[in-house]
Amino acid sequence: MNIYINDLSKYYKNKKALDHITLHLSSGIYGLIGPNGAGKTTFLSILCGLIKNDSGTIEIDEVKFLSDDFYHVFGYVPQSPALYVDLTCNEFLEYICALKSIDKNQIDHTLRLVNLYDQKSIKIKKLSGGMKQRLSIAQAIINDPQILLLDEPTTGLDPIERLRLKNLLRNLSKNKIIIISTHIIQDMDHLAKSLIFFKNGQLLDFKSPQELILSLKQFFYETIVSKKDLQKYIETYHVSSIVPINDDYKIKFFSHKDELFPHCKEINLEDIYLYYYGDVYDKR
């Protein structure tokens, strides 16, 4: 399965929500990264046919864009999925099957996939936040789509539920394209094969986590500063971590200039997020 996106653009009045996006995606998990307003939801909504692009093309192997077959290829989990909370899990999926003309025999198998089979007779309003999110994924995958899109699926979940969700998506990813939009970049650690960075509707970068770390490590420095000088460094540089050491602090920061400080031995995905979006949060 392949998605070919060429020169994709979308405007809202005079504002560019997406600005000439070109990507080629094959099977695997992708993290779609960016702060609020970066264009992530618009991008996913265009991909699954909810809204129309203004220019550019989308090709999906042999499937014609927006044809009847196209809608069977995609599963979509929006940021705020509509769940009928007075229904049981089983009743809700029966409704989804009727809506999509899918055999109801798929329900038990799908509930087992998302680890909700034991809750099939429980009303949705009694489920935890993590269970509701897994049920949202169940309704999106019940027809076994080849492409699964998830918009901020980990928002509001505790660390245990986030880990369960990551494991579920990893198990679902064989021979599928899964795109997960998030501003919590650490959720993509050891999950996404590549990260797609959006900012103001533009594509900033598209690399594997390992490639990103190798290419950006040169911009990160570390040093030890006194408590008295700490604020000066925070105001001068984009500081990504502060660790107390006795009466001093070990700080990590990035700079596009050649600094006289030692380079960091290690950086992580949170450092990379700050590298791309530190200026966005400085303005808030």
Role assignments for model-derived ranges:
Residues C48:
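Helix-to-loop junction immediately C-terminal to a conserved catalytic motif
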